[in-house]
Amino acid sequence: MTDIVDLDRYPLDKLESAEGQALIKDCQKALSRDGMFNLPGLIRPRMLEQMVGEVLPIIKSSSFTHRRRHNVYFLPEIEGLEPEHPALTEFETANHTVCADQIPDSALIKLYLWPPLADFLAAVMQKPALYPMDDPLACLNVMAYRS
């Protein structure tokens, strides 16, 4: 996995180490404060390019496209807002989805199925365990938003 993940910077495979525990605590703090955490450089640049190269042609040629019109709330009305309120203005979005079965041998699937990633995420979210989904389509989706 060292070819995909920068394990020197992010010791996901050594969560019991002092460095692993510090990473977990830092991510928990960011998650609590910001609702998210960011791990810049987690995926090595060369592998990130490879992952994009594996997925992009499929997005362009055979992704599932879903278009719909909606407002920012995805609801026709919001209590307390007049119908002409700007937040209720509708716009169209289109997302293009590639499912896991379309990229079965990709580096992205390899990363998703790597047990230390699930262990790390479980530790950050203070869950006893997380598991990869068995569904061969829904376990991993890559989405692109464009016209």
Give the positions of each predicted feature.
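Conserved short histidine dyad/triad with adjacent acidic residue
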Residues: 125, 142-147
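Short, solvent-exposed beta-strand-terminating loops
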Residues: 57-79
